[in-house]
Amino acid sequence: MFLGALWLLLLLPLRPPGAQGQEADEPTPWPSVKGLKEQLRKAGALSKRYWELFSCTLWPDHCEDQETPVPPLGWSLPLWGRRSLDVLTAWLCRFQDCCSGGGDCRISNNLTGLESDLRVRLHGQHLASKLVLRAVKGYLEMPQVGKALALSFHGWSGTGKNFLARILMDNLYRDGMRSDCVKMFISTFHFPHPKYVDTYKEELQRQMQETQWRCHQSTFVFDEAEKLHPGLLELLEPYLEPRSPEARGVEAPRAIFLFLSNLGGSVINEVVLSLLKAGWSREEITTQHLEVPLQAEIMEAADSSFGSSGLLKKHLIDHFIPFLPLEYCHVRLCVRDAFLGQDLPYTEETLDEIAKMMTYVPEEERLFSSQGCKSISQRINLFLP
């Protein structure tokens, strides 16, 4: 039915047969009854050509396999026919992304840009930058994947967990966090009431299934993961489990899961402080210093179900990413970036003054910003003319 309507719509604006490119004001007699069969054959061929042009406009990669080009027709492709084709194409592209080079243009996977952004925009997190880049790059470059990639971000508030997630989305997807292929859930906002957990489970599963059906590469971000209900954590397990051997020969959609949590922030700070006091530089701190104490604190947290969930017990989390506490020099860089981001002038004295407004702990050493880089944009407003 759709093809029939398309055929009629495209044939309505056609001119009578005549010379190639003949103008409308040059009349040509219609064919006799004896030539009607031939003209109908040409009409069918032209309709087929319209459909091929229409489909190639939407799915150009499907046209590369055609062995022989479509032979030229006796009728030209009229202006109004071309416009009809453009209208139909634009209408369908409202519901499906159409790319000039084929593929899914919603997905960019700009790993070079990701590496650059992590180096320039994310301050004081050499471990997180290196681990995330290596994990994501390795996952995306695999010919076939055996499971979803699961990364768990841990650290104090304001250390850059959400910021890194946003950088990642900006480089993997054309529309960043607003992409159809990205879903973000905040525990206290999307799942606030335990008594409605069954409803939350149905809605979460529906959104995840729809997103994976719509995108061959999707990302799900769970902020405040330590506050997720046990029922929701259990629901996520099948999505993170390795694929069965029988299904590994079939190409599966890729999925990235990011869990953002404050769990482990205290032990990360303690380890970093002790290493700095012992004479280590910040850049000399490795994952080996933090991996064991971080996972121990996560699993022993009494006020969270995350550590006791099947996600950890079944080893479904691929990497635990530590975010180190930020020092004065990092906060100062955040202040500078905030000015630059708003295209505002600043002085070195202003950067120092705003950075010193933050609270630093522990009380004796005053090394780490207790809020990280949070609230800096609000503090900048105090210095505007």
Swiss-Prot record:
Modifications made to the protein after synthesis: N-glycosylated.
One Pfam family cited in the UniProt record for this chain: Torsin
InterPro entries named among the record's database cross-references: ClpA/B, P-loop_NTPase, TOR1A_C, Torsin
Principal subcellular localization: cytoplasm
Keywords linked to the UniProt accession: ATP-binding, Cytoplasm, Endoplasmic reticulum, Glycoprotein, Nucleotide-binding, Signal
Family as reported in the entry's similarity comment: Belongs to the ClpA/ClpB family. Torsin subfamily.
Full protein name: Torsin-3A
Organism: Mus musculus (Mouse)
Lineage, opening ranks: Eukaryota, Metazoa, Chordata, Craniata, Vertebrata
Gene symbol of the encoding locus: Tor3a
